[in-house]
Amino acid sequence: MGIVPTRPPNKAGEILAAEVVEGRPVTKENIMESNTRLTQSGERVPQGLRGVRERARKNKQERFTALLHQVTPALLRDSFFALKRKAAPGVDGVTWQEYATGLEDRLIDLHGRVHRGAYQARPSKRRWIPKGNGKQRPLGIAALEDKIVQQAVVTVLNEIYEEDFRGFSYGFRPGRGQHMALDALYVAIKRKRVSWILDLDIKSFFDNISHEKLVQLIEQRIADPRVLRLIQKWLKAGVMEDGVWSETEAGTPQGAVISPLLSNVYLHHVLDQWTDQWRQAARGEITIVRYADDAILGFEHQDEAERYLKELKEHLREYGLELNEDKTRLIRFGRFARLNRTERGEGKPEAFTFLGFQHICGNNGLGRFEVRRITDGKRRRKKLQELKQELRRRMHAPIAQVGEWLRSVLRGYYQYHAVPGNLPILSRFRHLVVRLWYRTLCQRSQRRPTWQKLGPVFDHWLPIPHVLHDYPDARFYARRQMGSHPR
């Protein structure tokens, strides 16, 4: 078994407190009262769902026939306040602030429609945003009430699926994130017998999920026909673009709150369970870390990696999926791969990229094997190009205003990328940002400012990078000891 955990981290915890809902009118108190508990991840979960979680944990085969009653006015209220307040409106044209006016009456009406079967899902509004390669990708914006109901249903279903999902799955799950996935991968490569890395890329995964097969997979756990009808409504709601409606025959709804959970359910059955069964029968060690549709596997033996890849292609076809042949790679990587290539005079092993970091075989100061992680070059260049364009737009804005903005950008960039070993790359990134700002300031006037004059300005506004993340193995094992990251 791999070093990554095989059970989810956030079990049902002790009841810490009953939350008092703020700002509700006295007349609505009994209807809107929210009796909640906190999970280990800090998620707010209605107390009534504790039994659902316990049943899901104790009986992995149970099909839940009565779940919709868990969607209460109080849960809808919590779901509303969990939404982004500045998000663009969908086809309904309703913003968060507008819906907040008369909120309690709106939620009681919505609750009634959901339980009577009168609730209708609206199509998502499609917008197009540029990609780094010059192409565009669609962005869906859901209607506000769809977001509220979906968030409530996700809260209910998470109580079941968080007991089912594998420990090596990290994407879009309560209490988990990208750096947890990166830590798990680092530890697996460093501590386990990994000589080959398989970098999987499923072609247009979110667009090719079979609705029929997805519902069949959900039905293995969910047997409440009302919840199933809600999910089918969202799947069939379609897309509205320039006033024209189009049907969606496959894929998860664009911009839908429930889409990440649906995609995780699909991959749990299609990839995670299948891989778990496959590696239990393997003769060598196999590790896997998955974040949404981005998965990295480590193999001890080349022949098993090649056989896994061949059988996976056939398996995915049964579910309407296929690998992107141009992006899926099997490469030598790891401690033993480095030694073998050095002995053959083949140079260093190839690198691979996962969650924005390029992973490289290297050595630490003592000459021992180390996985080096640096910001992916494509991501870095894309960010610099975005900053260049925005600096041009802000060319004549006050220096202090631009400085505040750049400081915020750099801090956010460091917050994700400032891992051990990546400081030289971040220092270079800051230097390039300084040059971009300097060139922009030079274009404001015919009088070219000097470096000596602007140096203190750059030093004041642009923070120096520092390591903000602990070493992965220390952080990984600390989580496991605290019980938030078990095997």
Cite the ranges covered by each PLM segment:
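Non-catalytic terminal/accessory segments
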Residues: 1-487
